[in-house]
Amino acid sequence: MSTHIDAPKGAIADVVLLPGDPLRAQYIAENFLDNAQRYNTVRNAFGFTGTFEGRRVSVQATGMGIPSISIYVNELIQDYGVKTLIRVGTAGGMGENVKVRDVVLAQGSSTDSSIILNTFGAGLYFAPLADFNLLREAANLADTSAIRYHVGNVLGEDRFYNDEMDRQKLIDYEVLATEMETPALYLLAAKYHVHALSILTVSNHLVTGEETSAQERQTSFNDMIGLALGVAKTVPDR
């Protein structure tokens, strides 16, 4: 076990889906995985392991924000040997081409967080990127499934309520959406030489004001979940 995950060695698969919401983790386990067993309830950050079309997969809730996801990603990699991490989360859309319920494949993640500065020091602006093979597989699967999706840069923010951010400039620079976790996931994947991808569903739009309900965010977005599991299924055992 680790500080925040109460699971014995071997209880967690080498591929893990990472929803922020514990109830979304439970929804995925109950509706998509076969023979799912819960391995973690610490802080109600539920974790489950089961199989998807014969491939062993885990799903671990991470909570909200860079500090929280950093805890779980560090422990999954260092204490449980996880090699592939796929975030399945929500994001706020920006730009007129990005619609509510669209899927965003985060190729890279800009950030206003100090996590890059704290890691590299002043003057070096590291660019956290997705694993290309996972990204390519997700795009290919989305094409064959007729899922409406976008590939590009997202913004990982430290604050959910942030009126000071220049949204129009972000739109002008083709930032697709904003969320709160991807920079940490990609940074830690680079640090530990593992594989990571963020697959996001646009749950609300920052310009139009359109949004989904809390219930839909918790127990829906099946395109994103199915896409993530389809990618997970293709990952070779490591």
Curated annotation (Swiss-Prot):
One of its GO terms (molecular function) is purine-nucleoside phosphorylase activity. The gene is deoD. It catalyses: a purine D-ribonucleoside + phosphate = a purine nucleobase + alpha-D-ribose 1-phosphate; a purine 2'-deoxy-D-ribonucleoside + phosphate = a purine nucleobase + 2-deoxy-alpha-D-ribose 1-phosphate. SUPFAM superfamilies: Purine and uridine phosphorylases. This is Purine nucleoside phosphorylase DeoD-type. Belongs to the PNP/UDP phosphorylase family. It holds the Pfam family PNP_UDP_1. Keywords: Glycosyltransferase, Transferase. Phosphate binds at G20, R24, R43, R87, V88, G89, T90. CDD domains: PNP_EcPNPI-like. The record marks R217 as: Important for catalytic activity. It is an enzyme of class 2 (transferase).
